[in-house]
């Protein structure tokens, strides 16, 4: 079955990176273990981060408000919108184990010369992707 991102037009982005390198730090509870970054798209107006979440045990998933990106020497930039995933307190639900949810978080643009950045769901308790390489 086709997914909306399969036909997404990335022409407006200056840089598109599939499956970038990063270090992942899941939450203390195992719900985030199936989470990975599948694509990053950068433009002068926004940073688009696409994820894939593979459901293993739990039957629902969401993204917390306040999830942010941060490049070295910059302030935190919280996401502006989410595509194809529920934002807390709402939940995206699954029919079965092994089901994959593809979603995107859209953030403000990061500085053009940024070499790497991090994404964090929350400062202390949430999942984190660090050292996401873009150059």
Regions found by a protein language model. Give the residues of each.
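Conserved functional micro-motifs across diverse proteins
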Residues: 1-135
């Amino acid at each position: 079955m086709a997914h909306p991102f399969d036909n997404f037009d990335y022409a407006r982005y200056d840089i598109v990176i599939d499956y970038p390198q990063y270090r992942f730090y899941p939450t203390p509870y195992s719900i985030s273990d199936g989470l990975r970054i599948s694509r990053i798209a950068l433009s002068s107006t926004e940073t688009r981060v696409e994820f894939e979440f593979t459901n293993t045990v739990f039957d629902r998933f969401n993204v917390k408000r306040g999830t942010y990106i941060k490049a070295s020497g910059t302030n935190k930039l919280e996401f502006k919108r989410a595509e194809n995933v529920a934002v807390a307190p709402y939940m995206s639900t699954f029919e079965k184990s092994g089901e994959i949810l593809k979603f995107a978080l859209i953030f403000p643009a990061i500085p053009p010369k940024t070499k790497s950045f991090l994404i964090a769901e929350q400062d202390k308790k949430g999942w984190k992707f660090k050292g996401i390489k873009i150059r």
